[in-house]
From Swiss-Prot:
GO terms for molecular function: carboxymethylenebutenolidase activity. It comes from the Bacteria. The gene is ysgA. It comes from Escherichia coli (strain K12). The keyword Hydrolase applies. The active site is at C147, D204, H236. Its EC number is 3.1.1.45. InterPro entries: AB_hydrolase_fold, Dienelactn_hydro, Dienelactone_hydrolase-like. Belongs to the dienelactone hydrolase family. Keywords: Hydrolase. This is Putative carboxymethylenebutenolidase. The keyword GTP-binding does not apply. It is an enzyme of class 3 (hydrolase). It catalyses: 2-(5-oxo-2,5-dihydrofuran-2-ylidene)acetate + H2O = 4-oxohex-2-enedioate + H(+).
Length: 271
């Protein structure tokens, strides 16, 4: 059996499940690139359809705590098959490598907690700029993120006024603040620039339903264009097909809802 690193997954993500989805890449172009950002060159993975008739709608894909490992790369490939230019930047690259951490608690304390939200949001702006220079339609800019990236997706929806749509998968909504994370999504409910869909698991021990309801109340009070779907039988990381937490029915429904959300709000094609 291949180890997590041999198979393209972060070591802290083990044990791997037998439900891993691998998207065929014969109809897409995919690979690694480097994106100039804040004086550095940020590694990123991107995928796009081989055939297109002009600039492509753009989806920024924000990683889980495990970085841009094989699951996130496959998410990009799936989006490319749907006609998007999908880009997943390595948002921890200045602070360290997720592959150097063997377990989740050490990864969180030794790497993830060291990454400032402000740095991440600025990096994502540079990803959008790179996309506009590399076949992407900046007027159809969208974002989705998972776990750690789900929280970042909420924050980015309040950060970039050019964003057209956002979908956050089981991202933290409330909780403690720090110098690197001065705000939680509940704090920016009044500042959202784009319609946002949240996808959550009813059995998620890390994001209690009280937290979800608090966010819903904040969104209603702000009259925000937002919706939160809770899948009663799903836990955290229910879309992570490489983990035991995978809940296929919820993941498949969430994926279709995401595509519909992007189609509804993603903006019109540039002339």
């Amino acid at each position: 059996m291949a180890t997590t690193q041999q198979s393209g997954f972060a070591p802290a993500a083990s044990p791997l499940a037998s439900t891993i989805v691998q998207t065929p890449d014969d109809a897409i172009v995919a690979g690694f690139t480097s994106i100039p950002s804040q004086g550095d060159n940020m590694p990123a993975y991107h995928a796009r359809p081989k055939q297109s008739d002009g600039p492509l709608p753009v989806v920024i894909v924000v990683q889980e705590i495990f970085g841009v490992h094989e699951h996130i790369r496959d998410i990009c490939r799936r989006l490319a098959l749907e006609g998007y230019l999908a880009i997943a930047p390595e948002l921890y690259f200045r602070e360290g490598d997720p592959n150097d951490f063997a377990d989740i608690p050490t990864l969180l304390s030794g790497l993830v907690a060291k990454v400032p939200d402000s740095q991440v949001l600025a990096d994502l702006d540079h990803v959008a700029s790179w996309a506009s220079r590399n076949g992407g339609d900046v007027h159809r800019l969208m974002i989705t993120g998972f776990c750690w990236g789900g929280r970042i997706t909420w924050l980015y929806a309040a950060h970039n006024p050019q964003l057209k749509a956002a979908v956050a998968w089981y991202g933290k909504l409330t909780g403690d603040k720090s110098l690197n994370s001065p705000k939680q999504p509940v704090d920016i409910a009044t500042d959202l620039n784009a319609p946002i869909l949240g996808l959550y698991g009813g059995q998620d021990n890390s994001i209690p339903q009280e937290s979800v309801e608090t966010m819903r109340q904040a969104l209603r009070a702000a009259n925000a264009k937002a919706e939160i779907i809770v899948y009663p039988d799903a836990g955290h990381a229910f879309n992570a097909d490489y983990r035991p937490s995978y809940h296929a029915a919820s993941a498949e429904d969430g994926w279709q809802r995401m595509l519909e959300w992007f189609k509804q709000y993603g903006g019109k094609k540039s002339l």
